Design a protein with these regions (language model features):
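Alpha-helical linker/edge segments of TPR/alpha-solenoid repeat scaffolds
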Residues: 86-94, 107-133, 190-243
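Inward-facing hydrophobic residues that define packing positions of alpha-helical scaffold repeats
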Residues: 62, 96-97, 135, 168-169, ...
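A conserved position within tetratricopeptide repeats
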Residues: 31, 66, 93, 100-101, ...
Length: 243
């Protein structure tokens, strides 16, 4: 009997003797190819470069990794996220396109799509240049001015006020869940996905940094896990609005 272990756990196996060809076929299912290994190495190096602030070199590493293994969604996600943070929105749009045709669309790429939509709106629509006070005046006159509320949420998002953006989105969802093909709900779900803390590796403590690379600071920093607590709070608010 042959049992294949991964991280100390059995994942596959076979009984009796098998020909060399069958053995290679068995191993090929579980052993990453050369391109996969190179892509994983480049991804690790790129993440370290991003942590150190060397974004251009990180971008080059991620491009190299994606060329080596175009099917690696982790690399594609990190590259799109990095391009957005560097303001290279057209390049980010190009890199994300292959993932947008996936059925079903993976939530993290839907999240990046919503982020991109907001940034494109702010950079191309005249309302994207309005001061917040102008939105507030319109909303004070008509609390159901959802166009103004949604535009304000996108402006807040583009200026890195993610909680402010979600508060505005909740105001729309509370009054009309279906407005604009549920764009406020989709946007908020995307933001929550990007803000959800990264799963720890080999530990129980969160880093305070999200899977989308978003890091929020505030009065809740005294709590054990402010990022996760904040995300959970907004998830509950959204759930209450939808039920």
């Amino acid at each position: 009997t042959c049992v294949l272990l991964k991280n100390g756990q059995p994942v596959d196996g076979f009984m009796g003797a098998v020909p060399e060809g069958k053995l290679r076929e068995f191993l090929d299912k579980h052993v990453p190819g050369e391109n996969e290994v190179l892509a994983a190495t480049d991804l690790q190096e790129a993440e370290a470069l991003m942590e150190s602030g060397d974004l251009e070199t990180a971008q080059a590493k991620l491009l190299e990794a994606l060329q080596a293994n175009p099917e690696n969604d982790d690399v594609r996600f990190d590259l799109v996220k990095l391009l957005i943070s560097m303001g290279q929105l057209d390049d980010a749009e190009t890199v994300i396109q292959p993932c947008l045709s996936q059925i079903p669309l993976k939530l993290r790429f839907e999240a990046l799509k919503q982020w991109l939509n907001a940034l494109h709106f702010v950079s191309t629509d005249p309302m994207g240049q309005w001061p917040l006070e102008k939105f507030d005046q319109l909303i004070a006159t008509n609390k159901r001015d959802f166009d103004a509320r949604f535009a304000k949420a996108r402006v807040l998002l583009a200026s890195d006020d993610w909680t402010g953006a979600m508060d505005e989105l909740l105001e729309i969802i509370m009054r009309d869940k279906k407005w604009n093909d549920e764009a406020p709900r989709k946007t908020m779900v995307g933001l929550l996905e990007l803000m959800t803390p990264v799963a720890p590796k080999g530990g129980t403590d969160h880093t305070g940094k999200s899977a989308g690379g978003i890091e929020l600071m505030g009065k809740s920093a005294v709590q054990e896990d402010p990022q996760a607590a904040m995300v959970s709070s907004y998830r509950r608010k959204l759930s209450m609005m939808l039920n």
